[in-house]
Amino acid sequence: MAKFEGYLEKQKSRQQYFVYPLLFQEYIYAFAHDYVLNGSEPVEIIGCNNKKFSSLLVKRLIIRMYQQNFWINSVNHSNQDRLLDHSNHFFSEFYSQILSEGFAIVVEIPFSLGQLSCPEEKEIPKFQNLRSIHSIFPFLEDKFLHLHYLSHIEIPYPIHFEILVRLLEXRIQDVPSLHLLRFFLNYYSIWNSLITSMKSVFLLKKENKRLFRFLYNSYVSEYEFFLLFLPKQSSCLRLTSSGTFLQRIHFSVKMEHFGVMYPGFSRKTIWFFMDPLMHYVRYQGKAIFASKGTFFLKKKWKSYLVNFPQYPSSSWTQPQRIRLNQLTRSCFDFLGYFSSVPINTFLVRNQMLENFFLIDTRMRKFDTTAPATPLIGSLSKAQFCTGLGHPISKPIWTDLSDWDILDRFGRICRNLFHYHSGSSKKRTLYRLKYILRLSCARTLARKHKSTVRTFMQRLGSVFLEEFFTEEEQVFSLMFAKTTHFSFHGSHSERIWYLDIIRIDDLVNPLTLN
């Protein structure tokens, strides 16, 4: 680690970060190996057969990298293998995996150095990186009640791999590293099509998650640059930090390219996009823009988002990916919830002296519900039920012990209730609970080669009822002796937890196998 920091200190004074020589250092691949083992979530290495890290193999890899035609032979060999034998990736399974992981770590160095060089970001509290996903919804409830229009944005995906390389050219001045990145991307792009297919993107995401996340986050960061820079224009002009100054230069370059294609567009026109009450939220490939401005202003924003980001990165957003709706008349899917801001009407009886009259009061309410159809579809994809929601057994779990089967089903049920605790209607959650409970009973009955009724009579339903205890009931038992805290009979109580740092697997269909 000391060698790694020493190299960075030497290169920091040159204002250019030559990260390519780090690929010839053995400790880089040790970092990559430690990252795979100590990751925050399970990482599946495809095709490596769980091979352990070997310093001898890494030394052989570094020696081969010094050969003149190493990269050309490797890529040509990998393209031939993909046409003949899909199980033989690159020229060696271990070399391809460990090299791509090491490259993913090396290419992140200029970005990490840029963050450390900003004095404003040195003393950021660590807890900000552990904010719960549920903390977003109280923010939406506090802000969206006073806004008028909502824009649903789907970030363009997939894109051509060459666009990703061009986006990194402004931040990585190391030309050999960019060429090596092209080698890796051409390796994952099977047919070298003009538009990257979902198959090659899925292959890259599955074989090298770190590299995929780095490229995707870089692309999203470039896309968000146009979304967030304009609302901060008035404040950025008063700042003198180097980071903000570089952003303004980058924005001016974009403006020059945009002015060539649209001669009638001037810099003064950009000030018409200013909106002091604008809020932006994004998760994965979806983004939400909420504003209090007029409908005409939102249409100008849509035109800006469609045309402006494509210069000079050639990243074009299709108009149908941006939907503009009135906030009180739209429902948006976000983080596994169907959210809306309906207007509820209340009749209030007032009395003035001897006269009685009714006042029609209209009030906005931020409503969040758990979607039934997508969740049942996720359970069906995970083979817990049919497409219509009828519970079925889980054959691949019949080799486990009874306690392991109960533990897995119980954990899934508790996670669903925990993640969707902010739903105002619990009917969908009770339906999912019924599906998982009956699927668990059928799995156990299939294991013991008996019917569900016979198995339940022998085991008893009390054990399952105690196993699937809801968290609301646990809270009511904890606070029963001290205060009145009961959820019995209440199906509209919403609870937002502060310990949820990742989306539930059943909510996110991309994580299901």
UniProtKB/Swiss-Prot annotation:
Keyword vocabulary terms for this entry: Chloroplast, mRNA processing, Plastid, RNA-binding, tRNA processing
Gene Ontology cellular component list: chloroplast
UniProt-listed Pfam families: Intron_maturas2, MatK_N
Main subcellular localisation: plastid
Subcellular localization, as worded in the UniProt entry: Plastid, Chloroplast
One example GO MF annotation: RNA binding
A GO biological-process term: tRNA processing
Annotated InterPro entries: Domain_X, Maturase_MatK, Maturase_MatK_N
Source organism, top-level taxon: Eukaryota
HAMAP family according to UniProt: MatK
Annotated function: Usually encoded in the trnK tRNA gene intron. Probably assists in splicing its own and other chloroplast group II introns.
Similarity comment text for this entry: Belongs to the intron maturase 2 family. MatK subfamily.
Protein's name according to its UniProt entry: Maturase K
GN (gene name): matK
